[in-house]
Amino acid sequence: DGLSLQDNIEIGKQLHNDGVIDFLNLVSGKIDTLPRLTNYMPGMAAPLAPFLQQVAFFRQEIDLPIFHATRINDLATARHAISENIVDMVGMTRGHIADPYIVKKLMRGDEARIRSCVGSTYCSNFRYCIQNPATAREEHLPHIVSKNSDQTKRVVVIGAGPAGLEAARVCALRGHQVTLFEAADRAGGQVLLAGKVHWRNDLNTIIDWLEKEIQILAVDIRFNYFAEKADILAENPDVVIIATGGTPNTDWVNGNARVVNSWDVLSGMVQLTGHVFIHDQTGRNTALTVADYLSEKGVSVTLNTQDAQIGAEAMRLEMSPFMKRFYERNVELSVDHELLAAHAEDKKTRVTLRNIHTTNTSDEFVDHLIVEAGTLPNDDLFYMLKSDSANKGVIDLDLFTEGRAQPAHGESFHLYRVGDVSGSRDIHCALLDSLRLCAQI
């Protein structure tokens, strides 16, 4: 079972009495299983600063400076820990991964502009930050975007998901005049759906921060505006950035059965009861979120994937919170089966599966089928504008991946696309696209 809290206090006392230590740096937990590792490096499923009470016991027993770092994501939590005399110094490792300028912003009175860690644990998988694409890419991407020393340009961005918001933010920091069109009544795109499960709603703070920044930077954002080609050309733009995202990829399913997409479920547009079969083609968080969302409502859920494990591309430290909920709610998990077809039969849906190893087929009779296979680019507007643009919508990929400026030629506007309109990926990739492209415009 390891050392108890009291065991550790006694060890700390002995080390202090022996005079061999000057301070204590306290962490809590074990890392021998995935749930314990998740508890040791907690993400958004855990409360902020979950071990402060245990740290307080050390403070009461040992007269040494105490340092502590575990999910202290923001200065308000850090300030509480210090003001209550629980710790002498707070560690904010992931906080500084999200925003290396926490201290500088605080010192200059810009605490409200600090980009706080959301606890997605993206950094545990990829050593990058889900919301700060410059982290670990400092050799070619800036944390601080410099102002363009050349002329101010008119930049039009279409779509206020993470890619569009970041494009607008970075272009505004460059000193350009930015107009942002969004068809919906609020910003966020797919992130708003990702945060529908209550323990993951901290993802919404990514959008909150971006939206607050573009307001500070005086971006002209127009909601409830389905921008068409004429609307964009009327702005007389120098640069047009398409960030219109994608639409659910479900049309490939063979058969005549109704196929429901994840968006309609998470948005509340579709209400499902009975036995719901979810087929996941991506291994990312979306299917997991839908299974969590429905099972919490008491729906009987089967979650199937053709991968060798559920959530093969999800964040490793998010899998334990998902799996805990699935086991508690008797969600049936199925792996190694691809979806062949879905047919309507006697008010049921017959789902035909094939084992990818044996090639044996089997049928499941369910009430509803949800297919999560990512998105297809919503790129109609891009192709409407392509022939009128100076660069014909073409991007130099070598320059793009290095964060260098794209070629400037011709008298017409330059046209680019970022985020899922280029291909179905995740929040980090959408933000990375925009920073790479826009930091040198």
PLM regions and their residue ranges:
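Flavin-dependent oxidoreductase catalytic cores
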Residues: 1-158, 162, 166, 170-173, ...
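Flexible loop/turn segments at secondary-structure boundaries
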Residues: 1-3, 31-37, 73-79, 97-99, ...
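A structural motif corresponding to the C-terminal end of an alpha-helix
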Residues: 18-21, 57-65, 210-222, 329-332, ...
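Local beta-strand N-terminus motif with an aromatic residue
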Residues: 21, 87, 237-238, 366-367
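Short beta-alpha connecting loops at secondary-structure transitions
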Residues: 37-44, 88-89, 191-199, 416-422
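Short, hinge-like loop/turn segments at secondary-structure boundaries
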Residues: 41-44, 85, 107-110, 196-200, ...
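Rossmann-like dinucleotide/flavin-binding elements
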Residues: 149-183, 222-236, 243-316, 357-368, ...
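Rossmann-like dinucleotide-binding cores of NAD(P)H-dependent redox enzymes
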Residues: 177-217, 285-339, 422
